[in-house]
Swiss-Prot record:
InterPro entries on file: His_deAcase_SAP30/SAP30L (IPR024145), SAP30_C_sf (IPR038291), SAP30_Sin3-bd (IPR025718), SAP30_zn-finger (IPR025717)
Chain intervals for the UniProt region annotation (Interaction with NCOR1): 1-129
Residues found modified as Phosphoserine: S131, S138
Gene: Sap30
Zn-finger region bounds: Atypical: 67-115
Family: Belongs to the SAP30 family.
Protein name according to UniProt: Histone deacetylase complex subunit SAP30
Length: 220
């Protein structure tokens, strides 16, 4: 079982349900081949072997099923969703020292939405910074780091940003290319939170943004 990628998790239940359906079908086939014996176990590092099969023929958790994970030694009491756990996911989060593991008594591999989002945050953080930066980072810092979606900004705003910082670009860039260029520069800026908030509040109170818009209206 390959588990789910961050892209699958961000797309919601459809992709995760498809993965779960494959798991259920494989478990049902294994059960039929062994004379209706119990489903085969899936080994997860540090968590032992558990049954990887959910309800026969199901494409998701059964009614009332709870998340299959344990956090800090205690079983999660949240309802299971369509996202599923795997050895690959266990390995990726273990490098971040996140204290979650598969419960040995669980008879399925479905996890709750809370842990799905937690795993996504940790894995996205790992992709952004790379494994060289793992030392010294705490799980709380990794999880609480916000992800800024610059694609939500208007094209004119992205161009304003590019002009303000004099970013070298070729003419005729589309929005996706602007987002990539602005995003790389944005992540490299050291920020003093107190000074930034103070400047923002001052700008709002003095309508500084309106003045900027008028000044930039003649610049292309």
């Amino acid at each position: 079982m390959n588990g789910f990628t961050p892209e699958e998790m961000s797309r919601g239940g459809d992709a995760a349900a498809a993965v779960a359906a494959v798991v259920a079908a494989a478990a049902a086939a294994a059960s039929a081949g062994n004379g209706n014996a119990a489903g085969g176990g899936a080994e997860v590092p540090g968590a032992g072997a558990v049954s990887a099969s959910g309800p026969p023929g199901a494409a998701g958790p059964g009614p009332g099923q709870l998340c299959c994970l344990r956090e800090d030694g205690e079983r999660c009491g949240r309802a299971a969703g369509n996202a599923s756990f795997s050895k690959r996911i266990q390995k990726s989060i273990s490098q971040k020292k996140v204290k979650i593991e598969l419960d040995k008594s669980a008879r399925h591999l479905y996890i709750c939405d809370y842990h799905k989002n937690l795993i996504q945050s940790v894995r996205n953080r790992r992709k952004r910074k790379g494994s060289d930066d793992d030392g010294g980072d705490s799980p709380v810092q990794d999880i609480d780091t916000p992800e800024v979606d610059l694609y939500q900004l208007q094209v004119n705003t992205l161009r304003r940003y590019k002009r303000h910082f004099k970013l070298p670009t070729r003419p005729g860039l589309n929005k996706a290319q602007l987002v990539e260029i602005v995003g790389c520069h944005f992540k490299s800026i050291p920020v003093n939170e107190k000074d930034t908030l103070t400047c923002f509040i001052y700008s709002v109170r003095n309508d500084k943004n309106k003045s900027d818009l008028k000044a930039d209206s003649g610049v292309h």
